[in-house]
Amino acid sequence: MYCPRLDHFVRFNPNGTVSRCGHMVNPPQFATLEAMESSEWLVNTKHLMSSGQWPDECVRCQETEPNSIREYAIILDRETAQKDYLQVGGVLDNLCNAACQTCNQNLSSRIGSLTGPGFPIIDNSDQFWLLPQEQIVHLDINGGEPRYSKNYKRLLKNLPPNLKTLRLNTNCSTVLTELVEIANRGIEVTVTVSCDGIGPVHDFVRWPIPWQDFYRNLMTYKTMPVKLNLWTTVSVLNADDLLNIQKFALEHGIDHSYAYLKMPVELSVDNTDSAARDAYIAKQKQLRGIV
């Protein structure tokens, strides 16, 4: 049991540091890729997984085996000829038009704007361009929303020279039409759409993106030369709707994966403090003006 991401993935965090994998829970953060590669933590984590044990940071994949990101990483690694490749992901910036209930201002400028002036604007683009571009074979973009970011627009116009696969995470509030041209250049493009509910559940969790806009744009992506899949972050807000989401994905022939939310703890399905949960939800509704 081993995950190739331990050798090849670099994730940008909102504070400009790097971590190993975007699906890890509370991984250590490092100032540079070089510092992470030479860390005792990485040596110990690789040894642990090579011994058939799950590192604490990898609990999200452990809970969703055999349909975990680890399985996807194994396939991707097997199909990659360049052995010193990098898979780069994480937060390039936090410019986003949505204020999803499970998100925060470090991943969404829309949430920050609701709290008043002085909210953080994240920009890791300089750090990205310092990476060895020729080693970047897989690009895994998420957080904020690519359509609303000038940094992502620049990136899509200046992709690394050896890039083979491109994955973007989107709230599906609009369509990235430029992906057609990129796919036609022979780059495998995957669009991962965050789907945290059907109908009214979606409208609450993914506020303020309307379900009808989400659905229309999702159907447009189905007509494009891209691999399309759905991703669900399961929380107390949508756990009861998970079967409906899975049914929706099956009916439309779209691959679907999910993992359980760990933070904020108030919205975790493992949280037993109902008073804290209800207070958190009420505060978020008030912030967004939801009656």
Residue map of PLM features:
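Detector for the c-type heme attachment site
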Residues: 62-64, 103-109
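Recognition helices and adjacent regulatory flanks at domain boundaries
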Residues: 52-86, 96-98, 117-119, 123
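Accessory C-terminal segments flanking Radical SAM cores
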Residues: 1-75, 262-291
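Core AdoMet radical
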Residues: 85-95, 106-123, 134-149, 161-177, ...
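Leucine-rich repeat
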Residues: 127-133, 155-160, 181-184
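Catalytic cores of alpha/beta
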Residues: 236-252
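Generic structural signal for well-ordered alpha-helices
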Residues: 156, 179-180, 215-219, 242-246
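Acidic (Asp/Glu)-rich catalytic clusters
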Residues: 181-188, 222, 250
